[in-house]
Amino acid sequence: MMDFEDFGNPLAGKPLSQADKAAAVLLAMGKGVAGKLLKFFTQHELQMIISSAQTLRVIPPDELAQIVAEFEDLFTEGTGLMDNAKAIESILEEGLTPEEVDSLLGRRAAFQAYEASIWDRLQEAEPEFVGKFLLREHPQTIAYILSMLPSSFGAKVLLTIPEEQRADIMNRTVNMKEVSPTAAQIIEKRVVNLINEIEAERNAGGSTKVADLMNELDKPQVDTLLSSLETLSKEAANKVKPKIFLFDDLMFMPQRSRVLLLNDVSADVLTMALRGATVEIKECVLSSISPRQRRMIESDLAVPQASLNTREVAIARRAVAQEAIRLANSGQIQLKDVAAEEQSAAA
């Protein structure tokens, strides 16, 4: 129900009643829009508005602007003619275009302020963090995000992206057509999620440090430490586990990433790392290298050894794992295939 008694304070000149102001706003909207809105008034309110409209004095443009501004302020604050601001919004949407409703309720200014805050917040992160997360996005999305950033910051982010992808992204940025508001909002919502993820990772410095330490250890030592940590705090252990990558985790790496990684590792290191490994790990590694290199390594592994130098094996395995972490941090490979890991855990 309309509550005219709460609709603002008297304006300068001959004071207007609340019904006068309502009549003025409706008349200013025009016949088409006003006609659609009138059905939402009670019979008593309609009688008051009609009576006021018949005797309404001439209202100067500046005074009318004040009335409309007053009307806008009331709805922007969520109060006014009706108790339910959402109901008022739905009333306006029936009679006005989306642009007119946005303008009336001050949404456009609010959205622009929100939009600006997104890009300001993104700039607060390190370029390396931003680049790392952007690599998961479609190249066109990356191009749009870079186009929205200041040139100096955008250039730093671009340099964190692998060189083979930069040309494509720059080309997309140069040839980018105007993005529709709907598409822009979808991307900007993704940017908000991106910011939240970046901030969460920045705040997880402790778990990252612990994982870095564990990544320097052998698997039995890591398993023991994780078990002890889980006894103390399951939450802490769950934060650390995803950041640990050991030689045995090669089994959970996507095939394409595994091929890229092992292509960077020498045959001597791989041979040493595979000594004493399970059949599954051996096949996982050997199936990801060239046939020629596989034959060489299999030939070396077939030569019997008097004793297994566990220290050298551990060093070789750590070298492979550290190279994997380095490539993953630069965005060149993915460490774990979640589906494969879950399947292994369920087995």
Curated annotation (Swiss-Prot):
<dbReference type="InterPro" id="IPR032779">
    <property type="entry name" value="FliG_M"/>
</dbReference>
<dbReference type="Pfam" id="PF14841">
    <property type="entry name" value="FliG_M"/>
</dbReference>
<dbReference type="GO" id="GO:0009425">
    <property type="term" value="C:bacterial-type flagellum basal body"/>
</dbReference>
<dbReference type="InterPro" id="IPR023087">
    <property type="entry name" value="Flg_Motor_Flig_C"/>
</dbReference>
<dbReference type="GO" id="GO:0003774">
    <property type="term" value="F:cytoskeletal motor activity"/>
</dbReference>
<dbReference type="GO" id="GO:0071973">
    <property type="term" value="P:bacterial-type flagellum-dependent cell motility"/>
</dbReference>
<feature type="short sequence motif" description="Part of the EHPQR-motif">
    <location>
        <begin position="137"/>
        <end position="140"/>
    </location>
</feature>
<dbReference type="Pfam" id="PF01706">
    <property type="entry name" value="FliG_C"/>
</dbReference>
<dbReference type="InterPro" id="IPR000090">
    <property type="entry name" value="Flg_Motor_Flig"/>
</dbReference>
<dbReference type="InterPro" id="IPR011002">
    <property type="entry name" value="FliG_a-hlx"/>
</dbReference>
<keyword id="KW-1003">Cell membrane</keyword>
<keyword id="KW-0997">Cell inner membrane</keyword>
<dbReference type="InterPro" id="IPR028263">
    <property type="entry name" value="FliG_N"/>
</dbReference>
<keyword id="KW-0145">Chemotaxis</keyword>
<dbReference type="GO" id="GO:0005886">
    <property type="term" value="C:plasma membrane"/>
</dbReference>
<keyword id="KW-0283">Flagellar rotation</keyword>
<protein>
    <recommendedName>
        <fullName>Flagellar motor switch protein FliG</fullName>
    </recommendedName>
</protein>
<comment type="similarity">
    <text>Belongs to the FliG family.</text>
</comment>
<feature type="site" description="Part of the EHPQR-motif">
    <location>
        <position position="172"/>
    </location>
</feature>
<keyword id="KW-0472">Membrane</keyword>
<comment type="function">
    <text>FliG is one of three proteins (FliG, FliN, FliM) that forms the rotor-mounted switch complex (C ring), located at the base of the basal body. This complex interacts with the CheY and CheZ chemotaxis proteins, in addition to contacting components of the motor that determine the direction of flagellar rotation.</text>
</comment>
<dbReference type="Pfam" id="PF14842">
    <property type="entry name" value="FliG_N"/>
</dbReference>
<keyword id="KW-0975">Bacterial flagellum</keyword>
<dbReference type="GO" id="GO:0006935">
    <property type="term" value="P:chemotaxis"/>
</dbReference>
